[in-house]
Amino acid sequence: MLFDIYRKTFEADNDAFWWGGETHYRSWDDGTMYLYLFIVFISFLAAWWCDKRRFVTNASRCGSKYKISRCFLIIHMILLLFMGLRGSWVGIDTIVYSQTFENATSLSAVFNDDSTTEPLYKIFMFILRTIFFSRHVAIFIFSALIMYFVFKTLKKYYNSLCLAVAIPAFVCIYYFHSFNLIRITLAASFLLWSTPLLVNEKYKQYSIRILVTTFMHYSSIVLFLPLGL
């Protein structure tokens, strides 16, 4: 029943995509939905196990810290591998990022493409294109940065969070969206990682990070609002 609703929505919005001289159509696959449900389930299971490690006696606290770090690493790597190793057609915008990477052969090519894309993103793509020759590597690096910032924040506030809720919530609400909305998810994860600066009233440093992130995605500028309040 639920899959039928998803399928109808998917088919209604399944427009053609042109890239590389070819027209492509996305195809529905129940197996993909089962895979996504598996990711949600395994992230909940690992987060629950990590929460369980929290309730230990003082005598075994050192050992528990090691187990907690290992648990964080396991969850991190599972989510990173699925996100970073996805195909170019997983996520509508992934192919657009791939195309931007392929075309970023010089700064002039990057900045003369008649797009309104943020300058920091263009420079970052040019740097990646200079170092690497595969768009899949670029997508993996974007994914690795997103996951790093999110999990560094979760780990910092570990003692104040219920991971069995926090991690599955991240997966269901933001993780799958990041397969498509790469730039804004990277900007959001970086600013999430910067939240301690706001909490500790280090407004100048926080403002600098907002300003920098704004040149990755212009919507980041709204984060100046909490400073005004």
Segments from the language model and where they lie:
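Start-transfer (signal-anchor) and selected internal transmembrane alpha helices
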Residues: M1, T9-N14, G21-L79
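Extracytoplasmic loop-helix module adjacent to an early transmembrane segment
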Residues: G63, S69, I74, L85-S108
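Short hydrophobic/aromatic helix or loop-helix immediately within or flanking a transmembrane segment
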Residues: I95-N103, V110-F133
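Transmembrane alpha-helices of multi-pass, membrane-embedded glycan-processing enzymes
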Residues: M125-L128, A138-F149
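Transmembrane-helix signature of polytopic, membrane-embedded enzymes
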Residues: F151-C172
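Membrane-interface alpha helices of multi-pass inner-membrane proteins
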Residues: Y174, Q205-G228
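Short acidic/glycine- and proline-prone juxtamembrane loop motifs at membrane-interface regions
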Residues: S178-T185
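Membrane-interface transmembrane helices that cradle and orient dolichyl/undecaprenyl
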Residues: L191-Q205
